[in-house]
Swiss-Prot record:
Binding site for ATP: G112, T113, N114, G115, K116, T117, T118
Listed name of the protein: UDP-N-acetylmuramoylalanine--D-glutamate ligase
Gene3D superfamilies recorded: Mur ligase, C-terminal domain (3.90.190.20), Mur-like, catalytic domain (3.40.1190.10), NAD(P)-binding Rossmann-like Domain (3.40.50.720)
UniProt KW keywords: ATP-binding, Cell cycle, Cell division, Cell shape, Cell wall biogenesis/degradation, Cytoplasm, Ligase, Nucleotide-binding, Peptidoglycan synthesis
Disulfide bond entries: none
Single GO MF annotation: ATP binding
Amino acid sequence: MAAVAVVGAGKSGQAAARWLALGGRRVVLWDGRDSEALRVVAGALAPFGVEAVLGREFVPEEPDLSLVVVSPGVRWDHPGLVAARARGVTVTGEVGLAWESLSHRRWLCVTGTNGKTTTTALVGHILKTAGLRAPVCGNIGRPVTDLLLEPEDYDWIVAELSSFQIESAQGIRPEVAVWTTFTPDHLNRHGTLERYAAIKAGLLMQARRAVLNGDDAYLGARRSAWPDAWWTSTQAPAAVSLAGKDICIENRPVLPVSAVRLPGAHNLQNVLMAVAACHLTGVGDAAIASGVASFIGVPHRLEAVGEYRGVRFINDSKATNYDAALVGLTAVPAPSVLIAGGQAKTGESGPWLRAIAERCASVVLIGEAAPLFEKWLRAQDYRAVYTAHTLERAVPMAFEQARAQGAQCVLFSPACASFDQFRNFEERGDRFRALIAALAS
């Protein structure tokens, strides 16, 4: 029996390995890391016949290897993948694997640098409100291959796709695709901004209908390149736009802006894109309005997690780059106390640093980026900087700063990846939430 290699033992790799093994394939799961948690994963997959290789980078050593399935966290130019392709072995991502078996379903895919999680979740919520079976999956937390393990007669598959997932699922052709925003991110993975943009654009070019955010500077400047797309804008005429106090589809009022429960101008952009996408699926105005009005947001994105002694705590762990963190800063009342830091990324930090100086009473820093961020802030003559190193120390420090300086809230918006101290932004946000619960208990 030909072997299948699954590279990466995260959620998507586990789901892919399980489904392939249940289909009678001989599966070897590879992960360059080794930990107690991964050994637990290996033990859970062993009854399905999955062999696990931990602590070694993937090499295509099986002579009868027929397929390699790649998790999103594994570089597409990983030497093992390059060697496999050179041998003529098919290499695909977990999303590409799912597409092969679910291409007969209607897919609605959302991508973008920022805003994609909220937009994806809102689309799923609206479709559910309309009575449709539309599971939400992909980069939002549930592997797409989970749908293969629980086959149902879905009306739509709503998938949030990162650039990593699109890169390794090049055959995917959604019915509707949404591009939320575009700013520099993941350049350590993709190399150039042009390559990063081309990956995002590729998804929309293969879609039957495209939705783009006209308020995004990069996308709006390329409007002529997408003449058949559905454009949205909070600032200018568009297929879905604002007129007075209403959200309109082709100048037809659908619901009042006041019905939107999400904070911040950026979330109004997300709402307009979700409205456009759901309209293109055939959902009526009443269901769209009801879905938007009943949607309260997603975990880890400007999530209110508690209040203690007059100070509100906001979990924005999903803000893993400067642009997302800037959005968070401008969405909460000033002055606030900011907790930031983690594993620093490349990108333009200037607007974020200026917003800190204008809106933050003080900043508490954690993680690897703390010395760099302190240097940047002090170079701007911003002095209210404190280093806590860990989230456990940062929370009480930030609370005391808020009380002392009359700040209304503590905002945890890292502007960094989480991998220096946590497995992902979800674990980081969950830890912040738990610390706030302990503080208030």
